[in-house]
């Protein structure tokens, strides 16, 4: 008979312990799983709490900043206004004293600037020199304003063209305005009776300046003078035209009268040669006298009657008419 090596009762206990061990392991595993979930939930809740804490900190910081700004504003409001006034007065003291505001309001005309220009007179302009060339020659000595050159008369121009001359414009004399009179005086003093110069083979190299400074004369004076001369010329022309018309009319009337008198005298002479003392000559002479002398007008006047004159009776007029018929 085989002997037992182990106790059955002990084996049963060990098996129970083993089963219990397995059960404990499973229970431990089951306990481990929810703990992990709890840890995740705990981590999530902690993150949310941290975010909320950060938001609360930010809100608290904003509130503190707003309070600080309000405190700063209150502090600036507390600064007395006298300091600002003192600062403004200090700035005003630094400004120049002669500074003025330029206001152009309606009803207040602005005073015009003083005219400091000067005018020179050129008694002779080189032949066929244009105003642009003259300006280019005088500009180096100062700022040039207006230029006026007198053209040659139309009659002399037509005569020159008929003689085979060039069609370019020819100017006789002129006036030049400088914006500053000191430049005009300098030009008149230093360039008068001097050669124009420039390139040696230039067209105007040997021409001579003839310049005179017009003291106390401005450009508007020249314009007024030219306008007055044009008005006087037009008035003289109108007077001459009216005088010529009246002279022509009187001449034609005298010419017609002379022809008529010559015709009458010729007819009278013919009749005298024929020995006919016709009455037609007297009639012709009367006609001539009527044409030469103005007719005399005579007016017939009615007789004066008194208010007390008696009116004729009704039957007297009829009797007078019947007596004249019988």
UniProtKB/Swiss-Prot annotation:
The keyword Oxidoreductase does not apply. Residues 21-30, 266-290 have a biased composition (Basic and acidic residues). Keywords: Nucleus, Ribosome biogenesis, RNA-binding, rRNA processing. One of its GO terms (cellular component) is nucleolus. CDD domains: RRM_ABT1_like. It is found in: Nucleus, Nucleolus. Residues 11-20, 45-77 have a biased composition (Acidic residues). Signal peptide: none annotated. Disulfide bonds: none annotated. Residues 1-77, 266-326 are annotated as: Disordered. Residues 118-208 form the RRM domain. It comes from the Eukaryota. GO terms for molecular function: RNA binding. InterPro entries: ABT1/Esf2, ABT1/ESF2_RRM, Nucleotide-bd_a/b_plait_sf, RBD_domain_sf. One of its GO terms (biological process) is endonucleolytic cleavage in 5'-ETS of tricistronic rRNA transcript (SSU-rRNA, 5.8S rRNA, LSU-rRNA). Involved in the small subunit (SSU) processome assembly and function, and in the 18S rRNA synthesis. Required for the early cleavages at sites A0, A1 and A2. Belongs to the ESF2/ABP1 family. This is Pre-rRNA-processing protein ESF2. It comes from Phaeosphaeria nodorum (strain SN15 / ATCC MYA-4574 / FGSC 10173).
């Amino acid at each position: 008979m085989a002997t037992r090596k182990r106790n059955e009762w002990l084996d049963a206990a060990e098996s129970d312990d083993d089963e219990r061990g397995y059960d404990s392991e499973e229970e431990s595993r089951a306990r481990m799983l929810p703990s992990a979930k709890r840890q995740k939930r705990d981590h999530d809740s902690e993150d949310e709490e941290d975010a909320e804490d950060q938001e609360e900190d930010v809100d608290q910081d904003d509130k503190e900043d707003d309070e600080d700004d309000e405190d700063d504003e209150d502090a600036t409001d507390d600064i007395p206004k006298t300091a600002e006034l003192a600062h403004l007065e200090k700035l005003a003291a630094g400004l120049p004293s002669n500074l003025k505001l330029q206001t152009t309001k309606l009803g207040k005309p602005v005073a015009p600037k003083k005219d400091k220009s000067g005018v020179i007179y050129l008694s002779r302009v080189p032949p066929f020199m244009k105003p642009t060339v003259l300006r280019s020659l005088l500009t180096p000595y100062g700022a040039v304003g207006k230029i006026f050159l007198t053209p040659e008369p139309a009659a002399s121009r037509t005569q020159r063209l008929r003689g085979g001359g060039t069609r370019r414009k020819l100017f006789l004399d002129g006036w030049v305005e400088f914006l500053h009179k000191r430049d005009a005086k300098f030009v008149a003093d230093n360039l008068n009776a001097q050669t124009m110069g420039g390139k040696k083979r230039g067209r105007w190299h040997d021409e001579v300046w003839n310049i005179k400074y017009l003291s106390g004369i401005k450009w508007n004076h020249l314009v007024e003078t030219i306008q007055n001369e044009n008005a006087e010329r037009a008035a003289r022309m109108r007077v001459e035209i009216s005088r010529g018309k009246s002279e022509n009319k009187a001449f034609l009337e005298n010419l017609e009268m002379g022809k008529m008198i010559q015709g009458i005298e010729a007819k009278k002479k013919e009749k005298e040669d024929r020995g006919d003392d016709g009455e037609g000559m007297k009639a012709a002479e009367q006609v001539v006298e009527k044409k030469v002398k103005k007719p005399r007008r005579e007016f017939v006047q009615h007789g004066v009657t008194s208010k007390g004159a008696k009116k004729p009776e009704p039957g007297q007029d009829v009797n007078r008419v019947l007596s004249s018929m019988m």
